[in-house]
């Protein structure tokens, strides 16, 4: 049964979330080096060993994509179209605005937005195939305008291949694990070198992304999935169902409920046991519930949000809008009793590729911005440069960079006067 703990137990939960990457890094280092040195030859060996590849290339033929697409049921196609429409709509909301405006006479500042050239999406296919992750990683890239989108999946899952074809993805590779990350990071004759690799994966995928972050852009290093729910008087059946929905992902997943009500805590614990009885994924979910999950009793909902901010959960469920202003750190927030986390996993629109293990303190989920470069632009008139010349040359010479100062003076004919320096602020303001 799930543990019911006092809020003072939160530090123990935080300590147990540390990603176990050190051992995995030792395993993947030789794989990365082999792919870097030997390219396709090493990649094929690993793909045959780990990914059940039975062909002479990791590239999936277009005919296979078309065949998989033709085999999709109407129900599945409709589900993809519904989810894709919302994912695309949300991604469009995130596109940065291009601008160029005059901030002072003759000085124009702005930015232009450009997509990355090549992006690789990693789609896990271990315990569960994830066509939803294909949509979450590919659609924002399409909205961003990335011209070359590649997909890697360890197995030829019909739903993944068919969804790729529905979305118009043409370059799909049957490869997984660290070898797939290395292939995209270094490039081979078959696999193009990517500017950025996105998408979740096993601990070995995470370790490979971490080690190669200096050679290729990545989204973030993701650990086991997690949800934190805050509720004082929610429906026990709903809360238990949401916790199990997270727990069934992985034995290392974490589901945490923070509540002010001991009665609710006991009711949810009982509901979890009842719902586990006929859950097909109970073997996995039960281990996650027993090992990494808990119901914690707090004094107030305000304390619950404070603890949540310390935890910085991947998914955060709160009862209503009143707590949202207090939320500082979360990958994605679900508000109200009908905003189940499963909606975000599949079809509501916001991305489900989210930071875990406290990384939500630093960033949110995968977004269009991960596929774009925002390039600053500036235009100065002769008069604007003359106005800024005293500041530029003074700062340049203070740093010992005389050529910088002269590059201004050669255009302005020397300094056009000096402004009276401001006094330094005093301690009392």
Regions found by a protein language model. Name each.
Residues 1-117:
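N-terminal Rossmann-like NAD(P)+-binding subdomain of aldehyde/semialdehyde dehydrogenases
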Residues 136-147, 165-167, 185-191, 209, ...:
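Alpha-helix C-terminal capping segments
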Residues 101-163:
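Conserved small-residue-rich beta-alpha loop and adjacent elements
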Residues 301, 306-419:
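C-terminal core of ALDH-fold dehydrogenases
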Residues 220-291, 295:
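A conserved active-site cap/scaffold subdomain adjacent to cofactor or substrate pockets
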Residues 423-424, 429:
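Short, low-complexity intrinsically disordered segments enriched in A/P/G/S/L with frequent Arg
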Residues 168-254:
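Conserved NAD(P)+-binding/catalytic subdomain of aldehyde/semialdehyde dehydrogenases
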């Amino acid at each position: 049964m799930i543990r019911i703990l006092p809020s003072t137990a939160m530090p123990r939960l935080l300590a147990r979330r540390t990603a176990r990457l050190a051992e995995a890094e030792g395993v993947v280092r030789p794989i990365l080096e082999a792919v870097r040195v030997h390219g396709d030859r090493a990649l094929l060996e690993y793909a045959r060993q780990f990914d059940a590849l039975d062909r002479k290339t990791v590239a999936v033929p277009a005919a296979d994509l078309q065949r998989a697409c033709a085999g999709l049921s109407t129900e599945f196609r409709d589900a993809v179209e519904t989810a894709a429409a919302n994912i695309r709509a949300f991604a469009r909301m995130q596109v940065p605005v291009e601008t160029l405006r005059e901030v002072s006479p003759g000085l124009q500042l702005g930015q232009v937005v450009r997509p990355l050239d090549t992006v690789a999406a990693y789609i896990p296919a271990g315990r569960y195939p994830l066509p939803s992750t294909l949509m979450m990683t590919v659609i924002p890239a399409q909205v961003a305008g990335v011209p070359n989108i590649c997909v890697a999946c360890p197995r030829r899952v019909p739903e993944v291949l068919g969804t790729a074809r529905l979305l118009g993805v043409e370059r799909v590779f049957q490869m997984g694990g660290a070898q797939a990350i290395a292939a995209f990071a270094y490039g081979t004759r078959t696999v193009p070198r990517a500017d950025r690799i996105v998408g979740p994966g096993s601990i070995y995928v995470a370790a490979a992304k971490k080690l190669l972050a200096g050679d290729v852009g990545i989204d973030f290093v993701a650990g086991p999935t997690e949800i934190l729910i805050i509720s004082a008087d929610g429906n026990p059946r709903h809360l238990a169902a949401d916790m199990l929905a997270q727990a069934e992902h992985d034995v290392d997943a974490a589901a945490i409920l923070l509540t002010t009500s001991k009665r609710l805590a006991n009711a949810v614990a009982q509901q979890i046991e009842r719902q586990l009885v006929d859950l097909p994924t109970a073997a996995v979910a039960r281990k996650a519930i027993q090992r990494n999950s808990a119901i914690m009793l707090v004094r107030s909902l305000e304390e619950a949000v404070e603890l949540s901010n310390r935890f910085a959960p991947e998914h955060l469920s709160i009862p209503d809008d009143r707590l949202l202003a207090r939320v500082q750190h979360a990958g994605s927030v679900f508000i109200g009793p009908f905003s189940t986390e499963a909606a975000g996993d599949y079809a509501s629109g916001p991305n489900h590729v989210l930071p875990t293990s406290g990384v939500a303190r630093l960033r949110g989920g995968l977004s269009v911005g991960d596929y774009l470069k925002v390039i600053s632009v500036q235009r100065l008139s002769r008069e604007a440069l003359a106005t800024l010349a005293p500041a530029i040359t003074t700062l340049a010479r203070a740093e010992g960079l005389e050529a910088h100062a002269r590059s201004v003076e050669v255009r302005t004919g020397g300094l056009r006067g000096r402004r009276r320096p401001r006094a330094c602020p005093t301690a009392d303001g």
